[in-house]
Amino acid sequence: TMKLDYIYHSGFAIEADGITVIIDYYKDSSEEAPDRGIVHDHLLKKPGTLYVLSSHFHPDHFNRDILSWKEQRSDIRYIFSKDILKHRRATAEDAVYINKGDVYEDENIRIEAFGSTDVGISFLIDLQGVRLFHAGDLNNWHWSEESTPQEIRKAEGDFLAEIKNLQQKAPRVDIAMF
């Protein structure tokens, strides 16, 4: 069985048999305290391999606190967008870094990096027969009241180009997180 948990903002967790994946952790689900909520109260204590993915360096998608989780978990694997390293939010030893087009694969999971219309990457995840897509900051970014018609057309074209690329390489996606 597999369970999808919404954490906060763009943060999600996937709970599968013996595997947990946390994506774009910004803060935990509880408003009471920063170290309370589904991540600290449940997911970090759950047995099995823990994967932590971050799509880019913006603080609402990457919280450096996640690097301290390795003190509690010897079975943690970090997979980050290369812009996190470039912007010195983490060191080369902290994670495996991937760019658009790169694939991370081990005995449990396959993660392919797709593009973004902002910075960083989006993730296509194959896990226990389920294909999931996490968009990161891939979006049709424009604001009607601020953007010119030309900016709106460009934003929409960029977004649709990334979606078309995803569709060509992965015609089936079971769960999408935007």
What are these regions (language model features)?
Residues 3-6, 21-24, 110-116, 131-137, ...:
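Active-site-proximal beta-strand elements of phosphoester/diester hydrolases
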Residues 72:
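Short acidic-hydrophobic catalytic motif
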Residues 29-30, 57-62, 84-88, 102-104, ...:
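Active-site environment of divalent metal-dependent phosphoester hydrolases
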Residues 9, 17-19, 118, 128-129:
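Short strand-connecting beta-turns/loops that link adjacent beta-strands
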Residues 75-132:
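Metallo-beta-lactamase
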Residues 49-51, 76, 174-177:
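Conserved acidic residues
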Residues 2-16:
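N-terminal pre-catalytic "stem/leader" segment of glycosyltransferase-like enzymes
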Residues 13-53, 64-69, 138-170:
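Pre-active-site segment of Zn-dependent metallo-hydrolases
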